[in-house]
Amino acid sequence: MSLQAPPRLLELAEQSLLRDRALAIPTLEELPRELFPPLFMEAFTRRCCETLTTMVQAWPFTCLPLGSLMKSCNLEIFRAVLEGLDALLAQKVRPRRWKLQVLDLRNVDENFWGIWSGASALSPEALSKRRTAGNCPRPGGQQPLMVILDLCFKNGTLDECLTHFLEWGKQRKGLLHVCCKELQIFGIAIHRIIEVLNTVELDCIQEVEVCCPWELSILIRFAPYLGQMRNLRKLVLFNIHVSACIPLDRKEQFVIQFTSQFLKLDYFQKLYMHSVSFLEGHLDQLLRCLQAPLETVVMTECLLSESDLKHLSWCPSIRQLKELDLRGITLTHFSPEPLSVLLEQAEATLQTLDLEDCGIVDSQLSAILPALSRCSQLSTFSFCGNLISMAALENLLRHTVGLSKLSLELYPAPLESYDAQGALCWGRFSQLGAELMKTLRDLRQPKIIVFSTVPCPRCGIRASYDLEPSHCLLNACCQGGFI
């Protein structure tokens, strides 16, 4: 017969606190701070809303990372937490142990709860994230309470917790500092976005992603808010279209309205654009407005003119560039000089270069090779999808001998791998792949390298040849179509 172990002190405290709400305040006054997180988790799990309200008031840590505990919206619990904040805000003089300054609604700090429950140790990454949260700019002096959240607009509506919080926050304007670090837009009416932005401190926003199709006219309505995000580091724009109905002079006015916002962004470093056309012939206007060196320029499947590339190559802000991605921009008829100059400008810092599916031909490749060979920090190079001969590829590989940090290399299948009609000759591709691998191994020891074909017209998959001959890959649906 086994004896049941006596309940631990923590379990007794949980039972006492959660059984009798009237006992909560006196108990919390004397409770060791180490017991607060596990007790809070237990009250959260049991949905003891009155107890949660009381614990929020008496929280003995500067930060309450609620977001990592509340994985999905539970309006009842969320209201209980906000009621605790109301009680805290109403206190003109707080008890010494009541230290809550930050309510963090982001899902970033699971280890806070894990360490108190004994599940894990607090990681340096988690500590870093919590310190970062406290570095938010606070204009006009310290605010009594900061609420940190990331905003993600999708499915056309706001979730009920966010809706409730925004309404609650409006009624307490001046008492709260609502800090949003990341803003993601996947689909919602622009007037709803503006309504939300009017409730947060725009100075706090560091990353913005617009991942839904917008007309240029909608982007322009958003642009003034972008200019107020003075700590913005990263901007992502997907599928910004220009209506055929917009007159040319009106479009140019829109471009000025958008690009001028960058004059106010002193810390901007990372520009990502996919399928954006309105800057064609106007990229120089944006580049002139940049206030800080760029680390990342990603412009994929965008419309750019040769003059745009030339302006980019001479822009002072790209001299510390770490990532350049021009994937899907057709460069076939461009002079190779701007790209060569661009690589020269960034040769000391460039780590990632993606020129996939740019339509680059042998003569252009030959012109940029001297600059490419001096990019000493390059670790990732993607060049597949270009129309390059066997001789030009061998020359390219020879020019990578000094690039000791290369860890991922993606190259196109040689033109000789295809027949006159453009169909892949699989046997020929395998033979040429083996020759290229031998050439490369005679020069240096590659880490990850792949030679791949153009996408199959039937399935869209690229056949590839990597370091080991046994790893030649060919999509099964295409077997019959290859020689």
From Swiss-Prot:
Sequence ranges of the LRR repeats:
97-122, 177-201, 202-228, 229-264, 265-290, 291-322, 323-341, 347-374, 375-399
Instruction: Give a GO biological-process term.
Output: negative regulation of cell differentiation
Q: What is this protein called?
A: PRAME family member 12
Q: Which domain of life is it from?
A: Eukaryota
**This protein's UniProt keywords:** Leucine-rich repeat, Repeat
- UniProt keyword Repeat present: yes
Tell me which stretches of the chain form a coiled coil: none
Query: Could you tell me which InterPro entries the record lists for this protein?
Result: LRR_dom_sf, PRAME, PRAME_domain
User: Which family is annotated?
Assistant: Belongs to the PRAME family.
At the highest ranks, the source species' classification is:
Eukaryota, Metazoa, Chordata, Craniata, Vertebrata
Molecular-function GO terms, alphabetical: ubiquitin-like ligase-substrate adaptor activity
An example Gene Ontology CC term for this record: cytoplasm
